[in-house]
C-alpha cells in the first residue's frame, strides 16, 4: 500500500507539473531524472539552502485509460500483504514504540490471549496527577470532620485520617524540616505535601509578575501572517458603497468653525498674538491673596427685606389698623405676629420720632448673623381641627343612654356589684354589708332582700332563658338563689337543675370544692338552694363568669394563685381547677361566646386557652401595668381590656397580639367594662366618677376596621374614699345601663 500511494501521488503531481514544465523548458532541462531507489531516499521538490534545486524522483508514465489504472491497482493490492508483513516484522524488530505483549493461556476460556505490562505514567501523563488515593471526588471535605477517615480509595476502602501534631509540632517542623517551607496543605489528603520544582517555579513567576509558563518567550520573532511577502491583502475587507456624508459638508463641523469665527471677531481669540518670553521673571505680592482653606466658605448673610408701604411715615389708609386690630395684635405672642410694628401716619417726615426698637433690632440682627443658622423656618399655621379624624355625629348613632332615670340606694355600704336578668326586667345588687337586693329595673321597687355574713364580692345572673336563678359570692362560698314569684314551670326546672332528686355519679377524681344542696321540702326563698364551699384560704370570690349555655360557671378568688380559678359544671356537679400553675395573679376570666376558648387576665397579660385541646393559643400584650377589667365582644373576635393606669385597649384577635387602639379618656383608674349583647355599644367606668359610652360597630368585612366613636359622658355618682363607679352592666334588650358606685347607689341610665 505504501508503494502504491507513492506511485499515485507521483502520477498526480506529474499531471499538475506538465503545464509548468512546458513554460519553463529551460529550467526543467537542467534537472536530472533519478531512479526509483534514489527517489525513495530524497524528498521530492525541495530546494536546498545553497540555491540549487533538489532532484525529483523517477515518475512512471501515467496510464492512457481508467481500465489500465484499475488493473494496476489490483496488482498492487495482491502484492501489498507481503510487503506490509515484511515491513511490520522489520519495524517490530527495529523499533519498540509500544511494549511487547506476552501470549498466555486464559484461565477462564482456555484460549491464548495477549497480556501487556502495566503502564507506568510519567509526569507528562494525564493520569499521573489524578491518581490520588482518596477518590471521594469534588465534595466538601468538612463532611468528614467528625469521622475517623477522610474518604475512600479506588477499591472502596477507607482512607484513614493522618495524624496531626499540635502547634509545638508545627513550630518544630518549621525549624527541623527543611521541606516545611516548600510544602502545601492538601485538603483531600488532609496533610502537607512538598511542592515540586515546577510548582515552586510557577509560584516564583507569579510572585514576580511574570508569565507562569517557563517555555514562553516574550522576544520571539514576529510572524508576518498577513503582511509577509506574497500575503498582502488585495481584496477590500468591506465592499459597502461610500456613504453620502463623504461628499456632504458636516453640520457640526460648520457650527464649530462658526464658533471660532465669532470668537475671532469678538477679540476673544487673537490669531497672530505676539509671543511673550517665558523666561522673564514676574514679581507678585505674597500678601495679595489669603491662604486657601479646606472648609467651604461661609454662606453670605441674608439681606434685609426692602421696606413696604406699611413702613412708610404716611401710608395709605388701608394699611392703618383699627382699634380692634391693635388689641388683637397686642394679645398675640411676639413670634406669632405678622409684623413687628404697627403702621403709623404722620403729616410730615420731621414729625416722625426716633425708632424706639432700633437698638434691639440691631442687636437681634447681629445675633442672627453670628449665631443663627442660615435657614428660615416658616411656622406652619395648621388648623388643629383638621388633624382630628372625621367621625359621625353622635345624634346619628342613637339610641344610647344619656340621662339617669332612677336611683337605687344601699344605705349601709358600698354597692360593689350589679347584674341584670336575661329578660331585662329584674336587677340584683350587692354591697359590702352582706346585703343582696332584688329590685325591678323599670320602677326601682325592691322585691326581696337577702342578708349574708360577710361582704358581697360578686354576683351574676344565669344566662339561661328557661331557668331563673343567680349566684352570689361571699367569703369562700358561692350561693345560688332563686327569686320569688316565678312561673311554676320555670321554678320546677330551676329546682330540678340545682337540687335534683337523683345525684349524678361521683367523678373519678375527687374535688376540693364541696357541693351542698337543700332538700325541696325544707327549702324556702329566703335561703340558698345550692352552695359551693371553696377550698380553705381561697378568699373572697371577686368575679363570677357564666358560660353562654349556663352549664359552666367560672369563679376567681382573691386567695392564692393555685386555688384562685375554678370551673364548676352543674350537670356533673363537679369542680376542677384548670391550671396547676399560673404565672401571675389572675384578675378576671371569661368564656368565649362561640368557641371552647377561655380568657385569663393576669396583671399584665391576657392569655387565651383552648379548653378542648388544653393548650395556649395566644398571649395578648396590652401594655398595661395592672389589668382591672376585661370583656369580650359578642362576635368573639374583639376584646377590650382596662387597667388601673387609665388605659383602655381594643384588641382584634384576628389582627395582632398588640392593641389595635388605645383609648385614654378617663382621668383615674378604670374599674369596669361591658359590651352590650345586641347593640353596638360598650361602656367603661372609672374612679373619676364618670361613665364613658362608646359606639363600637364591628363589620363582617375583615378588611374594614371597627368604628369606635365616643358618644356620651355620664356623671351622677359621688366619689367616696377615692373610689368611683365599681361596675357597669347593660340590659340585654334595651340600650339601658346600670352602674354600681362606692357611694352605695345603683343608677339606671336610659336613652
From Swiss-Prot:
SUPFAM superfamilies: WD40 repeat-like. It is found in: Nucleus, Nucleolus; Nucleus, Nucleoplasm. Keywords: Nucleus, Repeat, Ribosome biogenesis, rRNA processing, WD repeat. InterPro entries: BOP1/Erb1, BOP1_N_dom, WD40/YVTN_repeat-like_dom_sf, WD40_repeat_CS, WD40_repeat_dom_sf, WD40_rpt. One of its GO terms (biological process) is maturation of 5.8S rRNA from tricistronic rRNA transcript (SSU-rRNA, 5.8S rRNA, LSU-rRNA). One of its GO terms (cellular component) is PeBoW complex. Residues 34-92, 119-129 have a biased composition (Acidic residues). GO terms for molecular function: ribonucleoprotein complex binding. Pfam families: BOP1NT, WD40. Residues 294-305 have a biased composition (Pro residues). Residues 1-140, 289-336 are annotated as: Disordered. This is Ribosome biogenesis protein ERB1. The gene is ERB1.
Amino acid at each position: 500500500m505504501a508503494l502504491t500511494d507513492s506511485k499515485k501521488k507521483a502520477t498526480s503531481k506529474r499531471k499538475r507539473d506538465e503545464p509548468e514544465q512546458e513554460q519553463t523548458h529551460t529550467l526543467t532541462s537542467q534537472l536530472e531524472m533519478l531512479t526509483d531507489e534514489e527517489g525513495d531516499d530524497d524528498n521530492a521538490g525541495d530546494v536546498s539552502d545553497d540555491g540549487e534545486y533538489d532532484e525529483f524522483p523517477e515518475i512512471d508514465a501515467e496510464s492512457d485509460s481508467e481500465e489500465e489504472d484499475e488493473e494496476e491497482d489490483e496488482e498492487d493490492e495482491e502484492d501489498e500483504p507481503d510487503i506490509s508483513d515484511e515491513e511490520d516484522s522489520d519495524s517490530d524488530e527495529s523499533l519498540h514504540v509500544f511494549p511487547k505483549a506476552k501470549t498466555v493461556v486464559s484461565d477462564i476460556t482456555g484460549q491464548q490471549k495477549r497480556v501487556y505490562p502495566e503502564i507506568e505514567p510519567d509526569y507528562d501523563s494525564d493520569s499521573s496527577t489524578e491518581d490520588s488515593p482518596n477518590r471521594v471526588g469534588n465534595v466538601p471535605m468538612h463532611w468528614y470532620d467528625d469521622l475517623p477517615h477522610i474518604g475512600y480509595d479506588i477499591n472502596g476502602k477507607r482512607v484513614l485520617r493522618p495524624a496531626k501534631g499540635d502547634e509545638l509540632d508545627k513550630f518544630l517542623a518549621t525549624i527541623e524540616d527543611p521541606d516545611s517551607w516548600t510544602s502545601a496543605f492538601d485538603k483531600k489528603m488532609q496533610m502537607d505535601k512538598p511542592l515540586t520544582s515546577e510548582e515552586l517555579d510557577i509560584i516564583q513567576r507569579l510572585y514576580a509578575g511574570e508569565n507562569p509558563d517557563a517555555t514562553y518567550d516574550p522576544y520571539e520573532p514576529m510572524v508576518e501572517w498577513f503582511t509577509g511577502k506574497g500575503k498582502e491583502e488585495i481584496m477590500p475587507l468591506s465592499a459597502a458603497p461610500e456613504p453620502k456624508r463623504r461628499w456632504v459638508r458636516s453640520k457640526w463641523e460648520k457650527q464649530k468653525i462658526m464658533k471660532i469665527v465669532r470668537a475671532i471677531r469678538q477679540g476673544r481669540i487673537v490669531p497672530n498674538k505676539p509671543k511673550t518670553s517665558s523666561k522673564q521673571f514676574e514679581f507678585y505680592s505674597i500678601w495679595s491673596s489669603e491662604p486657601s482653606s479646606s472648609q467651604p466658605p461661609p454662606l453670605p448673610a441674608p439681606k434685609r427685606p426692602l421696606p413696604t408701604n406699611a413702613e412708610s411715615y404716611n401710608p395709605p389708609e388701608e394699611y392703618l389698623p383699627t382699634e380692634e386690630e391693635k388689641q388683637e395684635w397686642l394679645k398675640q405672642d411676639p413670634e406669632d405676629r405678622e409684623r413687628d410694628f404697627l403702621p403709623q401716619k404722620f403729616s410730615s417726615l420731621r414729625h416722625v420720632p426716633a425708632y424706639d426698637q432700633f437698638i434691639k433690632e440691631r442687636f437681634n440682627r447681629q445675633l442672627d448673623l453670628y449665631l443663627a443658622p442660615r435657614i428660615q423656618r416658616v411656622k406652619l399655621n395648621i388648623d388643629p381641627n383638621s388633624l382630628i379624624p372625621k367621625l359621625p355625629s353622635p345624634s346619628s348613632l342613637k339610641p344610647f343612654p344619656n340621662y339617669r332615670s332612677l336611683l337605687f340606694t344601699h344605705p349601709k355600704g358600698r354597692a360593689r356589684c350589679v347584674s341584670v336578668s336575661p329578660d331585662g326586667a329584674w336587677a340584683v345588687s350587692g354591697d359590702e354589708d352582706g346585703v343582696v337586693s332584688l329590685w325591678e329595673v323599670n320602677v326601682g321597687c325592691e322585691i326581696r332582700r337577702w342578708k349574708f355574713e360577710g361582704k358581697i364580692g360578686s354576683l351574676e345572673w344565669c344566662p339561661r332563658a328557661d331557668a331563673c336563678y343567680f349566684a352570689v359570692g361571699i367569703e369562700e362560698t358561692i350561693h345560688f338563689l332563686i327569686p320569688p314569684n316565678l312561673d311554676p314551670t320555670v321554678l320546677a326546672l330551676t329546682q330540678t337543675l340545682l337540687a335534683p332528686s337523683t345525684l349524678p355519679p361521683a367523678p373519678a377524681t375527687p374535688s376540693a370544692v364541696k357541693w351542698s344542696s337543700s332538700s325541696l321540702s325544707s327549702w324556702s326563698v329566703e335561703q340558698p338552694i345550692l352552695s359551693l364551699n371553696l377550698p380553705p384560704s381561697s378568699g373572697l370570690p371577686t368575679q363570677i363568669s357564666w358560660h353562654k349555655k349556663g352549664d359552666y360557671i367560672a369563679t376567681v378568688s382573691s386567695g392564692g394563685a393555685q386555688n384562685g380559678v375554678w370551673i364548676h359544671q352543674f350537670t356533673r356537679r363537679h369542680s376542677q381547677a384548670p391550671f396547676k400553675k399560673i404565672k401571675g395573679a389572675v384578675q378576671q376570666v371569661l368564656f368565649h361566646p362561640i368557641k371552647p376558648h377561655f380568657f385569663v387576665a393576669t396583671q399584665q397579660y391576657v392569655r387565651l386557652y383552648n379548653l378542648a385541646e388544653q393548650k395556649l393559643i395566644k398571649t395578648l400584650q396590652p401594655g398595661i401595668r395592672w389589668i382591672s377589667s376585661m370583656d369580650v365582644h359578642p362576635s368573639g373576635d374583639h376584646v377590650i381590656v382596662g387597667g388601673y393606669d387609665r388605659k383602655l385597649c381594643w384588641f382584634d384577635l384576628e389582627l395582632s397580639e398588640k392593641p389595635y387602639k388605645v383609648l385614654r379618656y378617663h382621668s383615674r383608674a378604670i374599674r369596669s367594662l361591658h359590651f352590650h349583647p345586641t347593640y353596638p355599644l360598650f361602656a367603661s367606668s372609672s374612679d373619676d366618677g364618670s361613665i364613658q359610652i362608646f359606639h363600637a360597630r364591628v363589620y363582617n368585612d375583615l378588611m374594614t376596621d371597627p368604628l369606635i366613636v365616643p358618644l356620651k359622658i355620664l356623671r351622677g355618682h359621688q366619689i367616696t374614699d377615692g373610689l368611683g363607679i365599681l361596675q357597669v352592666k347593660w340590659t340585654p334588650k334595651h340600650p339601658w345601663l346600670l352602674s354600681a358606685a362606692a357611694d352605695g347607689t345603683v343608677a339606671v341610665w336610659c336613652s
